[in-house]
Structures are given as structure tokens and as C-alpha cells.
Amino acid sequence: MKNITFIFFILLASPLYANGDKLYRADSRPPDEIKRSGGLMPRGHNEYFDRGTQMNINLYDHARGTQTGFVRYDDGYVSTSLSLRSAHLAGQSILSGYSTYYIYVIATAPNMFNVNDVLGVYSPHPYEQEVSALGGIPYSQIYGWYRVNFGVIDERLHRNREYRDRYYRNLNIAPAEDGYRLAGFPPDHQAWREEPWIHHAPQGCGNSSRTITGDTCNEETQNLSTIYLRKYQSKVKRQIFSDYQSEVDIYNRIRNEL
């Protein structure tokens, strides 16, 4: 037991526990299962395709979870942590029934929001240091993973051969300002009348009037989040196409020179 504790504290102090361009998620599912799923998808993603249930892409609802502490069945976000240490602590708490689980190392991207930065003093669990991924995390965005056996993190980082650095190398999580409109506080929540959210309140939220179509605060937040996600997905698709076109151009140039 002393050896396990010693190893644990060495890992806590090591550089692999903090990396500004990487995030971490503890998950019971092995890499091959994550790959078959297309990545780390939100629970609401499966509900949407299986039952047609609309995903709830409300950050405040996501951060609160359910009254029992579990993930919402219609959740449109995937939780990650800022550090390996935070992910490990989360794993030891929520995955304590598993002798083996994994901590996935994930590249940052603009569909991710620092929950504490966006929700401020109204963040329900600030100690979790959570960064939430709107719409999920593709398998190509997963840099690699650590195995955790009986609470001890394997020192070896298993690299994901399908990670695409060129798609994500220059991407960061979204600035807090981008997330204020998507915070998802209830319509009459006092945050909408306070800094900084008062300047970003969607129509129908706080003192803002409803939209011309009569959308409620929650509906407008859902619409704005959907638009934000689609813009991000389009950006990544353009990057993928651009890289593919560059490779084709290089191939054609080499072929012409031969």
C-alpha cells in the first residue's frame, strides 16, 4: 500500500499532470469501444439517434447533472478535466467499482468551455475544474490514453494512431466571452442581471424580450448553441478538406516532376 501511495504522489507531481493544450477524461470504456462509437459522444447523442430525443445543449443543466448526481439522459456535453490529477480523482470517485479504467488525453478545441469561467460564481461544482465539450469529442481528437489499474495510473501513455494533430494543433478552448450567451441559466436567474452575463443574455432571458418567433429563453439558448456547434464543425471540416487538398497537390506535383 505504501508503494502504491508513493507512486500516486510521484504522478501528481510529474509534468504529465498538467498540459495547457490537452484535457483529460476518466472513462470505463476501453479505446476500441470508444473508437467504434466515433469518439467520446455525449449521452444525448445516443438518445437522439435511438429515440429521437432532442439533445439538451444547456451548459448550466449539464454542470448540475441530475438530482441523483448522474449525467442527464439528454446531455449534449462531454465532461473533461483540466489536469490528469483532476481526471484521476474523478475516476477514483465515479469509477470506483472498476478495477481498470482509462484516462483519455484530448486535444483542445473551440467547442470546449471552461465551466468555471463561463458560469462564474454559479458554477455548481467548481472544484471539479471541468471543461465541457459541446457535441462531443471525435476519436481523431483523442491524443492517447493511460490505463488505471486498481487506482494506479500506468506510466505509459498509449498513443492513438488515428489522432490527427494537424486538425487540432492550433486550436484552443473557447474564450469565456463566447460561452456567456450559452450559459443556459433559467429565464429569471439573477445572473442575467449581473456582470458579465447581462451583456450577453439571449432574447427571452432575464430582462431581454422574447424573439419575434416567441422563442423562450431555453429555446433561444438551444438555438444559439446549435449554431455555435455547427460553425465549429464546419471549421474542422474545412481544415480537413484543406489538408486533403494540400496532400493531393503535393502528390500531383511530385508525379509531374517524375
Curated annotation (Swiss-Prot):
One of its GO terms (cellular component) is extracellular space. InterPro entries: Enterotoxin_A. Disulfide bonds join 205-217. Pfam families: Enterotoxin_a. The keyword Signal applies. Residues 1-18 form the signal peptide. GO terms for molecular function: toxin activity. NAD(+) binds at residues 25-39. Keywords: Disulfide bond, Enterotoxin, Plasmid, Signal, Toxin, Virulence. The active site is at 128. Heterohexamer of one A chain and of five B chains. Belongs to the enterotoxin A family. The biological activity of the toxin is produced by the A chain, which activates intracellular adenyl cyclase. This is Heat-labile enterotoxin A chain. It comes from Escherichia coli O78:H11 (strain H10407 / ETEC). The gene is eltA.
